[in-house]
C-alpha cells in the first residue's frame, strides 16, 4: 500500500511511527476533538482529502451515521479502506477531486476540509466548492506561514494607499512556484489573517480556533439572492456588495468635496 502519511493505530500497529511531525495527525486531533460532540449519532460527515482515513475513522468512532472520505490519490484511498475495514468501521471512500464536489449529492452535517487548501492551485475556488457541501459545521485547516498575528483593516482603501501591503499582518498568501518541503503540490500558503479573511469571504462564521492552523466554522452568509457565491461567480453575476454611503469606484459619497 506504499508509505503512509497518517499515523494510524491499527490494532496496536502504527502506520507512520517515524513521521517528521510526530504522532500526526493525532497531535492535531487531540486539540480539535474537544470542539466536536462526543456523539455524532445520526450525523453525516464529508472528509475532503481524507488521505489515510484518520479523520474519517475518528468521526465514525463517534457514531456518525454516514461518513464519506474523498481523495484523488489511489494509494491513500486504499490505505483508508484497509484501515477502516480492519478496524471494523463502515466508511465510504471514493476517488473525487475538490473541483468535482458538485457531483456528490446533498449536504453534510460536518465537512472536514483539512490539509487540502494549500495543495490547490485554485484554493479559493476549492474552498467555495467545499462550503456548498456544508449544512452545519465546517472544519478548516491549512498550513500557515508568515505572521500569526491579525489586525484591523478598513473595508476599502483608495488607489494611492499601499502601506498596508507592507504590514506583515495584512491578509496575504505566498505562492510557491516550484516546490516547498520537496512537494510540488504546495501551491499557496496563507498567513493567519488571510486564512480567516477567506473563511469569512466564503460566508463562514468562525466559531473557534482550537489549534493554530485549524478553525471551526458555521455557514452564515454563503448565499446572495438565494445562490452560492461560487455559482454567481461562474455565471458572471457576482457583483460587489455596495455598503451604505460607499462609492464602489473608489470614494465615499458622503465625503466633502
What function would you assign to each model-found segment?
Residues 117:
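Conserved SAM-binding site of S-adenosyl-L-methionine-dependent methyltransferases, i.e.
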Residues 1-107, 114, 156-157, 161-163, ...:
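Conserved N-terminal segment of class I S-adenosyl-L-methionine
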Residues 99, 108, 112-113, 121-251:
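S-adenosyl-L-methionine-dependent methyltransferase catalytic module, highlighting the catalytic core
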Residues 74, 120-121:
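A structural helix-start
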Amino acid at each position: 500500500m506504499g508509505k503512509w502519511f497518517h499515523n494510524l493505530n491499527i490494532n496496536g500497529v502504527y502506520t507512520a511511527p517515524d513521521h517528521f511531525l510526530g504522532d500526526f495527525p493525532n497531535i492535531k486531533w487531540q486539540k480539535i476533538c474537544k470542539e466536536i460532540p462526543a456523539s455524532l449519532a445520526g450525523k453525516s460527515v464529508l472528509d475532503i482529502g481524507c488521505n489515510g482515513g484518520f479523520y474519517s475513522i475518528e468521526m465514525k468512532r463517534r457514531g456518525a451515521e454516514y461518513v464519506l472520505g474523498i481523495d484523488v490519490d489511489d494509494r491513500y484511498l486504499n490505505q483508508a479502506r484497509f484501515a477502516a475495514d480492519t478496524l471494523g468501521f463502515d466508511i465510504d471512500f471514493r476517488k473525487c477531486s475538490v473541483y468535482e464536489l458538485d457531483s456528490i449529492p446533498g449536504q453534510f452535517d460536518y465537512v472536514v476540509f483539512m490539509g487540502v487548501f494549500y495543495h490547490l492551485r485554485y484554493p479559493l475556488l476549492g474552498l467555495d466548492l467545499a462550503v456548498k457541501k456544508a449544512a452545519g459545521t465546517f472544519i478548516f485547516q491549512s498550513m500557515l506561514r508568515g505572521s500569526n498575528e491579525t489586525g484591523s483593516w478598513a473595508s476599502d482603501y483608495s488607489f494611492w494607499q499601499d502601506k498596508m501591503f507592507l504590514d506583515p499582518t495584512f491578509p496575504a498568501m505566498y505562492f510557491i512556484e516550484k516546490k516547498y518541503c520537496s512537494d510540488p503540490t504546495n501551491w499557496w500558503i496563507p498567513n493567519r489573517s488571510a486564512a480567516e479573511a477567506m473563511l469569512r469571504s466564503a460566508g463562514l462564521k468562525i466559531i473557534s480556533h482550537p489549534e493554530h492552523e485549524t478553525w471551526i466554522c458555521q455557514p452564515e452568509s454563503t448565499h446572495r439572492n438565494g445562490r452560492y457565491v461560487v455559482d454567481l461567480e461562474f455565471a458572471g453575476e457576482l457583483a460587489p456588495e455596495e455598503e451604505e454611503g460607499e462609492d464602489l469606484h473608489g470614494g465615499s459619497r458622503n465625503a466633502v468635496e
